[in-house]
From Swiss-Prot:
This is Large ribosomal subunit protein uL14. It comes from the Bacteria. The keyword Protein biosynthesis does not apply. Pfam families: Ribosomal_L14 (PF00238). Binds to 23S rRNA. Forms part of two intersubunit bridges in the 70S ribosome. GO terms for molecular function: large ribosomal subunit rRNA binding; structural constituent of ribosome. GO terms for biological process: translation. PROSITE patterns: RIBOSOMAL_L14 (PS00049). Belongs to the universal ribosomal protein uL14 family. SUPFAM superfamilies: Ribosomal protein L14 (SSF50193). It comes from Bartonella bacilliformis (strain ATCC 35685 / KC583 / Herrer 020/F12,63). Part of the 50S ribosomal subunit. Forms a cluster with proteins L3 and L19. In the 70S ribosome, L14 and L19 interact and together make contacts with the 16S rRNA in bridges B5 and B8. One of its GO terms (cellular component) is cytosolic large ribosomal subunit.
Length: 122
């Protein structure tokens, strides 16, 4: 459950380390984002010689949340930290690698490129 002002880790090699959510896309009154949703983020912390700079405003896909994800079979999946992958306007990842596992729910929300780059799909 991601809302405005939430800090997230970046799970790709785009050059950003931490980002902060500044808007949840998908409706004027929408308050929260979950796995697979697109948010607008501001880059807060970067590594040297990365593709993005501190202060850049970008779009990102939420790939891991600390809040439970309930599945149709009754199982629950949750992660230790919130994480996102930076994407361009065509919803393609900016980085070329994804770090850490991603949930199967991304496949249903048409983020196939992120699923294919991930080392593990839960």
């Amino acid at each position: 459950m991601i809302q405005m002002q939430t800090n997230l880790d970046v799970a790709d090699n785009s050059g950003a380390r931490r980002v902060m959510c500044i808007k949840v896309l998908g409706g004027s009154k929408r308050k929260y984002a979950s796995v697979g949703d697109i948010i607008v983020v501001s880059v807060k912390d970067v590594i040297p010689r990365g593709r993005v700079k501190k202060g850049d405003v970008m779009k990102a896909v939420v790939v891991r949340t600390a809040k439970d994800i309930r599945r149709a079979d009754g199982s629950v999946i949750r992660f230790d930290r919130n994480a996102a992958v930076l994407v361009d306007n065509k919803k393609e990842p900016i980085g070329t690698r994804i770090f850490g596992p991603v949930p199967r729910e991304l496949r249903g929300k048409n983020h196939m490129k992120i699923v294919s780059l991930a080392p593990e799909v839960l």
